[in-house]
Amino acid sequence: MKIAVAGTGYVGLSVSLLLAQNNEVCAVDIVPSKVEALNRGESPIVDEKITEFLYKNTTGECPLNFRATLNQSEAYEDADYVVIATPTNYDPMKNYFDTSSVENAIDAVRNVNSAAWVVIKSTVPVGYTMNLRKSRNDDRIIFSPEFLREGKALYDNLHPSRIVVGAPADDSQAIAAAENFAQL
């Protein structure tokens, strides 16, 4: 399975490495130094398991099918799934989530790949994914919340207390895609 991941923070990088054990994963970021570090096998974030996985990948002890890139089109064009793990800043004074990074990532995916399933892992408000599916007339978007601790993100992905992937109850294709993603 070919999977692209938008964002290489705690959520994006941990899910990338988890999935790269059995899938071809390409992580996308907009920060050149992060992409370069990842491709050298160095973690740009503090997480013991992420550091260990990247190191073991470079030594061949634990080979991963993982690479990072700045080129969104290259990453997204042949992907079966694209995981969106971009930042969504919440302003408690305005009670507002800035979801523009999620929407921009989905736009970049759809510019080159209309068939990929988009899996939102970013923190978004309740009902956001359903509203996005309707407003964009795009039924290939599903949601999978993250339950990760900072600094323990990969460990938490490797040993999940639960796996949740949401899809509309009346959309059998989305349900099948969600079930498939949960098994990856």
What residue ranges belong to the model's regions?
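NAD(P)+-binding Rossmann beta1-loop-alpha1 motif at the extreme N-terminus of oxidoreductases
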Residues: 1-44
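A structured beta-alpha segment of the ubiquitous adenosine-cofactor-binding alpha/beta core
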Residues: 49-79
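Short acidic/histidine-rich motifs immediately flanking catalytic phosphotransfer sites
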Residues: 77-81, 114-116
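Redox-cofactor binding/interface segments in oxidoreductases and associated redox assembly factors
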Residues: 82-84, 120, 165
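Short glycine-/small-residue-rich Rossmann-like dinucleotide-binding loops
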Residues: 86-88, 123, 169
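Rossmann-like NAD(P)(H) cofactor-binding subdomain of soluble oxidoreductases
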Residues: 90-153
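Internal alpha-helical scaffold of NAD(P)-dependent oxidoreductase catalytic cores
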Residues: 131-142, 149-184
